Amino acid sequence: MLEGDLVSKMLRAVLQSHKNGVALPRLQGEYRSLTGDWIPFKQLGFPTLEAYLRSVPAVVRIETSRSGEITCYAMACTETARIAQLVARQRSSKRKTGRQVNCQMRVKKTMPFFLEGKPKATLRQPGFASNFSVGKKPNPAPLRDKGNSVGVKPDAEMSPYMLHTTLGNEAFKDIPVQRHVTMSTNNRFSPKASLQPPLQMHLSRTSTKEMSDNLNQTVEKPNVKPPASYTYKMDEVQNRIKEILNKHNNGIWISKLPHFYKELYKEDLNQGILQQFEHWPHICTVEKPCSGGQDLLLYPAKRKQLLRSELDTEKVPLSPLPGPKQTPPLKGCPTVMAGDFKEKVADLLVKYTSGLWASALPKAFEEMYKVKFPEDALKNLASLSDVCSIDYISGNPQKAILYAKLPLPTDKIQKDAGQAHGDNDIKAMVEQEYLQVEESIAESANTFMEDITVPPLMIPTEASPSVLVVELSNTNEVVIRYVGKDYSAAQELMEDEMKEYYSKNPKITPVQAVNVGQLLAVNAEEDAWLRAQVISTEENKIKVCYVDYGFSENVEKSKAYKLNPKFCSLSFQATKCKLAGLEVLSDDPDLVKVVESLTCGKIFAVEILDKADIPLVVLYDTSGEDDININATCLKAICDKSLEVHLQVDAMYTNVKVTNICSDGTLYCQVPCKGLNKLSDLLRKIEDYFHCKHMTSECFVSLPFCGKICLFHCKGKWLRVEITNVHSSRALDVQFLDSGTVTSVKVSELREIPPRFLQEMIAIPPQAIKCCLADLPQSIGMWTPDAVLWLRDSVLNCSDCSIKVTKVDETRGIAHVYLFTPKNFPDPHRSINRQITNADLWKHQKDVFLSAISSGADSPNSKNGNMPMSGNTGENFRKNLTDVIKKSMVDHTSAFSTEELPPPVHLSKPGEHMDVYVPVACHPGYFVIQPWQEIHKLEVLMEEMILYYSVSEERHIAVEKDQVYAAKVENKWHRVLLKGILTNGLVSVYELDYGKHELVNIRKVQPLVDMFRKLPFQAVTAQLAGVKCNQWSEEASMVFRNHVEKKPLVALVQTVIENANPWDRKVVVYLVDTSLPDTDTWIHDFMSEYLIELSKVN
């Protein structure tokens, strides 16, 4: 293939993986991340990259935005059209195309330092060693020699079914195009078969139960070796792994294996193979240490133990429950200690379930048994290995944790004793038989194994994975399939291999006899080959469930073939989930119908709340500008329509209560109706219920999530609220369903709706009607604080107002009304609409940007541009906080002096290390660091600011440049430095704890009270040491950002530049990424090499 054609194909593959296109400055980096090389546009005869791209219009579509930014998009072609089908293909006879669904969920980032960073254990600093770090990895010196610096972890971890060796069209089948497909649900097969939860599944041919029962139990089977991939040289890989393990008889961490593999064989070890080790007992033994963490230990295979297990008809476990890695006795140590001493040590360790430091053993031993501890015991810990498990820290024999060994089952002890006295000749004979069985499996790839073990389906680790909803019978058992590289894309590749295997092998014939529960390969419609399990059998037909798709079908026996074991290494892709918030109505036919119509055949982003056997999830439709909570939408869709308020145009309504007025002039009203009366009665019953019942833990909200409806006690009454945003485990935002008020509260202040009232409460629709004043002059423009204040003083919480409806906007959910007070009804010339336009309230003052006075004792609080003011959140909302506010936030216009600023944050001295987090990175010459040790304190402060300012009064302040304030940015309150005042009502601020520059509405700026001035400002401007460049290109800046932004790193301080203002301090540091197990990546070395490579290309 010509180089130009190859570059075009690789370029199309890169662009097809980015639905929203790739900005021109980022294209080189994206291309290199996939291919390892730059786009060689100069070698192809073009002076610039853009010139080359414009020369291949069949591959690239170029668009230029209004701001001048150039974005590249992929052009479709027949050769790569099937790439789009790699996303969760739903096999059925009828397919329909629908709107494309984007499931890149815009997750609300509430704790960037924890949710987006790595755990503290990744930083090799002794003060932050967690159980993970202690039990998992050695603790060497913080930094190693810089000559060993650059170690880059591959971004993409390949699936067992995503391996290829050619560069033709087939080579691009593993490039997933995710979250774009709407699948058909017309051809549903019934009866619906139950599918397994995502846990360990064993399927037996001898099973006689129905599918629904069969998939929820575990049947132990002999271990069979399923190949990870049949396009890969698996035998060679397995032999190499054997060689590595033989060199490490004491075991090796599974996370370190790829590093050793690459060092020895100069090749990358496919990441998918790491998941197959548990199914290779003839290659290795896998153990999980009890010291915590997710890493596993690998040992050379124990052939004789495996041998007994393979031939044992009683399915006895292979070995005792694995403990931590044990180190053999050290040379030169004394002989084994007395049995009574070991027995006492074993009894002592039983009392320490979390383990006991070896150094603490003598004292604990003497205190318990009142006898002297043997002097040489600690020098020979290995001799205690037969009575306890020993976990050496950092390979240091002087530092170890001792764990009590778990007792073996009685039948296992007896069996091992019998085996120990067995005849050597019998052992040799059985071992010979085992070798013959192993050889026969290797010789015949067509051999069908009657008993097959399929690995369990693992829940994706990413924050918001994508799922395709297949079908549901109730909301507690929704059949889904995960969409992604290791799931739907891997399955597509496997099915292509199945098609090739069964279509081109004439020796394979259909099954003659089948059993319920047996796994088969079925030739389905459109010449597709699918994995299926037998549910029932008839004379010439069998009923099967397609285990990767979740639906059932009757097929002819002539289309069913024995499933080759090599197609069993991929987990069954269809699984179940439970929709959060809908449990109480899970079987309601109306709810099931609504959920099915909104979800089946579509792809959604999913928030996994509880990773149980059947995960508890919230589905989000992210195809539009805003994320739509599907769970909440379905719940609102089944409300009792007879309890809704249906406003009629030109109708008059009296006794209307204005419950809320937002800062943009939007009103929320309550209109007397049947639903409001029923709600009042129900809330009174709940009040009596809580008054008579002792408050237990079941009444508190233990698992908050967006869209959940619960209760909040406000001004002596219980009110309905819906959670709209979860900031952290302590603080969240709620909206009062029946008044429209939005505020922030503590999780501990919420209560679950008692089960006996839950169904009735959910059925009542929200009673707050969103309105706006009709026929206001267009010249009014943006509402001024004075106009909002006048409207609040006039009608807020007035229960006998009247409205006349002029228009109902169904799409926006808002009614245009004329509003009247009791004195002025029904004269339209004296309506609130006319009065507010005649008043002198619309002059935008230059020096005052915020309303000055509260509207009275019952006046509520405002919250950002959409924060309503309601009696529900007035001064009595949280009395203790309001008292503090009144004392600390007095009326004044002068800014706080610099003497009231917190002390500067502590930085290490030049030449010393410190753990840091990088929240913002522009380029190596400018980025921001935060001390890792202070992040928890910052999290607590942010939560307190959310709760504090959500109930505080808006203050009349004259803001000044270069002064410190509190400002609300994206639903969070930050400590900011005001950098500039714009004429359009916005101000420019600098976040003093995160180092970001933002534009916010001036109404969201408040004084920073003393209680939030104690913690030093956390953001420190930094520059990368060890690299020189006067001007950084966008490409180099992006590479730098990708390696450091939102990551915890180790910083070696070179210079600290002090300044009187804490936000003007600067530090010059070396940055080191210590996340890899054996390599410290010095960022300045990496950037230097990158600049050299870039200069070669240019």
Swiss-Prot record:
SMART domains per the UniProt record, alphabetical: TUDOR
Entries under InterPro entries matching the protein: LOTUS-like (IPR041966), OST-HTH/LOTUS_dom (IPR025605), SNase_OB-fold_sf (IPR035437), TDRD7_LOTUS_3 (IPR037978), Tudor (IPR002999), Tudor_domain_containing (IPR050621), Tudor_TDRD7_rpt2 (IPR047448), Tudor_TDRD7_rpt3 (IPR047449)
Family matches, as Gene3D superfamilies: 2.30.30.140, 2.40.50.90, LOTUS domain-like (3.30.420.610)
Cross-referenced CDD domains: LOTUS_1_TDRD7, LOTUS_2_TDRD7, LOTUS_3_TDRD7, Tudor_TDRD7_rpt1, Tudor_TDRD7_rpt2, Tudor_TDRD7_rpt3
The keyword Cytoplasm is assigned to this record: yes
Location (main, coarse): cytoplasm
BP terms from Gene Ontology: lens fiber cell differentiation; lens morphogenesis in camera-type eye; P granule organization; piRNA processing; post-transcriptional regulation of gene expression; spermatogenesis
Coiled coil: none
Molecular function per GO: mRNA binding
Region feature Interaction with CABLES1, mapped onto this chain: 893-1098
Stretches assigned to the HTH OST-type domain: 3-76, 233-302, 337-406
Region entry Disordered, spans: 129-156, 855-874
Functional description taken from the UniProt entry: Component of specific cytoplasmic RNA granules involved in post-transcriptional regulation of specific genes: probably acts by binding to specific mRNAs and regulating their translation. Required for lens transparency during lens development, by regulating translation of genes such as CRYBB3 and HSPB1 in the developing lens. Also required during spermatogenesis.
Disease note: Cataract 36: An opacification of the crystalline lens of the eye becoming evident at birth. It frequently results in visual impairment or blindness. Opacities vary in morphology, are often confined to a portion of the lens, and may be static or progressive. In general, the more posteriorly located and dense an opacity, the greater the impact on visual function.
Descriptive protein name: Tudor domain-containing protein 7
